[in-house]
């Protein structure tokens, strides 16, 4: 038995029927050409009869303010096998994921489920993994899944994700003396971080407000249809994009790939809101999580936030891109002057009011930001599960009261995998955002082509 971490407690406290606090991932696999007709059934049976033992946190359940080992762990509660009705189109798959992502996890059991889904067109099957954010963040979740798969197409009998022993499982068995030493060291580092945080607040934030046109702070986000109270119903949409297209745009315009990603999202959001006559006159503000991990730990929440000006009030895509670049660069320069502990303390002070707003359920006229846009680094080499190649992986995140849309992306091989999750009742035809993303990429490619034509003509 171990006490809840404060961050674990926050994620658990935020949860209510219309606001589930789990994250998920949809993994699409290609069945090998020479596989028997019983390939998926054999895979499921191997998992069910596996003698591998679940490791923390997958064998932990809630017990008041503590995590306790589930001594009656029942794999059938967590692991399920279903089939889509014929013809098993991606549309039906996404509808099923939307429904599954809308339901709460059972707090009487360890807070995760895994579904194997067969019958998908193109001789494919899928795995949908859902786990509470109190257990894992996005970066940690990606690392966990990567560890549970193989880089070798010939490797068989791979251990299920919930049996892969990571650093947290080992850390939970650490002697008490070692834990106490780490706690004291953490307190010391927090105290040492305080002077630098105060200096940054006085020299950077307060000077930027009102002077730097690209600076954005909490509660500057305009009112929009993205910022409504949410219901329990979700809509999930996903699509893969060629990562080289983003690289080429970034190289041609001398910006980072992340700048281009944010600019493409900005243009798509602008087009979506305009189609619903709901574009605010002031720019949307995105909260962009940034990992500050300095090790290879596979769990815990080690993230800070950047508030990015999306410049959706500008019609010119190049102007939007430049404003986004400067806005993100301002935050990055600030964080470069701080250690990870100083960044966490700084973020707590600057973004604390926004967190209090979410926890309390209050809905002020102005939100801290309009939506979350997250880009999680993923595996660069092909992954396999008992010889089945992982074709695509799509993240599914969280929406909250006042934050009815979340855009989460991850890279895999040469692709950018985009997962959109939204409140179905708040945002009509949300899947059209995927079309607008493609249109915005083409818009930037057209701008670059014109620039090259001008250079050639001269």
UniProtKB/Swiss-Prot annotation:
Keywords: Acyltransferase, Glycerol metabolism, Lipid biosynthesis, Lipid metabolism, Transferase. The active site is at residue 133. Disruption phenotype: Cells lacking this gene do not make wax ester and only trace amounts of triacylglycerol. Signal peptide: none annotated. One of its GO terms (cellular component) is plasma membrane. Pfam families: WS_DGAT_C, WS_DGAT_cat. It comes from the Bacteria. InterPro entries: Acyl_transf_WS/DGAT, O-acyltransferase_WSD1-like, O-acyltransferase_WSD1_C, O-acyltransferase_WSD1_N. One of its GO terms (biological process) is biological process involved in interaction with host. It catalyses: a long chain fatty alcohol + a fatty acyl-CoA = a wax ester + CoA; an acyl-CoA + a 1,2-diacyl-sn-glycerol = a triacyl-sn-glycerol + CoA. Its EC number is 2.3.1.20, 2.3.1.75. It is an enzyme of class 2 (transferase). Belongs to the long-chain O-acyltransferase family. Bifunctional wax ester synthase/diacylglycerol acyltransferase (WS and DGAT). Catalyzes the terminal and only committed step in triacylglycerol synthesis by using diacylglycerol and fatty acyl CoA as substrates. Required for storage lipid synthesis. WS uses C(12)-CoA to C(18)-CoA substrates whereas DGAT prefers C(20)-CoA. Upon expression in E.coli and Pseudomonas citronellolis (DSM 50332) both WS and DGAT activities increase. This is O-acyltransferase WSD. It comes from Acinetobacter baylyi (strain ATCC 33305 / BD413 / ADP1).
